[in-house]
Design a protein with these regions (language model features):
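C-terminal regulatory/interaction module of P-loop NTP-utilizing enzymes
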Residues: 1-156
Length: 156
């Protein structure tokens, strides 16, 4: 690092210094409109990162293990249905059928909300209300129609 304000003094990094950055668009912006707010990065910035790794979405077993460990009060059938829903939601996202992704954090939030709503509603209504509150209420009308179709198929 060169500090031009300090007479061009060079600060050497610690030998164990590492930096990791994440990004959904590999710094290229978002030509398909799938990541709102994404902006292209300059090639000078991108050139500073020498190793690029593509990290896929969690697979079904990984999602199941995560739900078991983080939302232990979720009933087995709810967990299985939620896992299936997330898989189909991700498939719809990766094939550009919907613009809204679902992250592991979103999946866990949905699981927690289902558990909490089970104290207020019967099982089916708890799931539907949780899906509305966590996922569907923030969707575009087009995404909502596609995701509601997935919800109706899995949770009916």
């Amino acid at each position: 690092l060169m500090l031009t304000e300090d007479g061009g003094r060079v600060v050497q990094p610690h030998p164990q210094f590492r930096m990791v950055a994440t990004g959904n668009t590999v710094g290229q912006g978002d030509e398909y409109g799938m990541y709102q707010g994404a902006r292209p990065q300059s090639m000078a910035m991108i050139d500073r990162f020498t190793i690029w790794v593509n990290v896929p979405y969690l697979d079904k077993k990984q999602r199941d293990d995560l739900l078991k460990s983080k939302v232990p009060l979720l009933k087995d059938n709810q967990r299985e249905q939620l896992n299936q829903y997330v898989g189909e939601h991700l498939e719809a996202f990766t094939t550009s059928k919907v613009l809204q992704p679902i992250s592991p954090r979103g999946m866990l939030s949905l699981g927690d909300t289902i558990v909490n709503f089970c104290t207020l509603f019967n099982n089916k209504d708890a799931v539907n209300e949780a899906l509305e509150a966590v996922i569907l209420d923030r969707c575009t009308q087009q995404d909502r129609a596609v995701l509601k179709g997935i919800v109706n198929r899995i949770f009916s």
